[in-house]
Amino acid sequence: MEALHKKIREEGIVLSDQVLKVDAFLNHQIDPALMKEIGDEFARLFADAGVTKIVTIEASGIAPAVMAGLNMGVPVIFARKHQSLTLTENLLTASVYSFTKQVESTVAISPRHLSSDDNVLIIDDFLANGKASQALISIIKQAGATVAGLGIVIEKSFQGGRAELDAQGYRVESLARVESLAGGVVTFK
């Protein structure tokens, strides 16, 4: 997606050969016009998938997921990283390790929002080692629902997440595939 590539080139900051900072438009400050384009593109890519719900993890996946949900006319559920007084009943949970934050957390979704009738599109801001995606897949399976596919805003193709998801037979659509961050330069696949 050219608009996303341009934004990454102009406003993304390479912190290391493993870490790309995109807080100027995606995961701290949000560019609404770009999020609309991203949502439109996910809706186009998965128009034939029979999606009934979209699932993401708080917080950075919420903006692109909501835009896709708006375009597709389906609800968006975000897996919560923090327990709350209102999220208590027999939760669907999975552990996820964050490469960027270097912490493991438990994410949860209420079973009231997912059922075996659902065909779920996972949307996330990044795909690196695939741990967040695998956690969401686990939660969706616990509900007896089906995974329609995964929509990824930025994929770090040099890490193993995509290969693992491909090997499991999941459809993965990434809007920007980063091949390398070597030398402080973003190289797209």
Curated annotation (Swiss-Prot):
Residues engaged in binding 5-phospho-alpha-D-ribose 1-diphosphate: A128, N129, G130, K131, A132
> What's any GO biological process attached to this entry?
XMP salvage
Record keyword Cytoplasm present:
yes
Q: Which Pfam families match?
A: Pribosyltran
| Residues reported in the UniProt entry to bind xanthine | L20, N27, K156
Which keywords accompany this UniProt record? Answer: Cytoplasm, Glycosyltransferase, Purine salvage, Transferase
Give the EC number(s) listed in the UniProt record: 2.4.2.22
What's a Gene Ontology MF term here? xanthine phosphoribosyltransferase activity
Q: In which pathway does it act?
A: Purine metabolism; XMP biosynthesis via salvage pathway; XMP from xanthine: step 1/1
Q: Which InterPro entries match?
A: PRibTrfase_dom, PRTase-like, Pur/Pyrimidine_PRTase, Xanthine_PRibTrfase
Q: Record's Gene Ontology CC terms?
A: cytoplasm
Subcellular localization is given as: Cytoplasm
Q: Which reaction does it catalyse?
A: XMP + diphosphate = xanthine + 5-phospho-alpha-D-ribose 1-diphosphate
Q: What does this protein do?
A: Converts the preformed base xanthine, a product of nucleic acid breakdown, to xanthosine 5'-monophosphate (XMP), so it can be reused for RNA or DNA synthesis.
Q: Which family does it belong to?
A: Belongs to the purine/pyrimidine phosphoribosyltransferase family. Xpt subfamily.
**Subunit comment for this entry?**
Homodimer.
Mind telling me what this protein is named?
Answer: Xanthine phosphoribosyltransferase
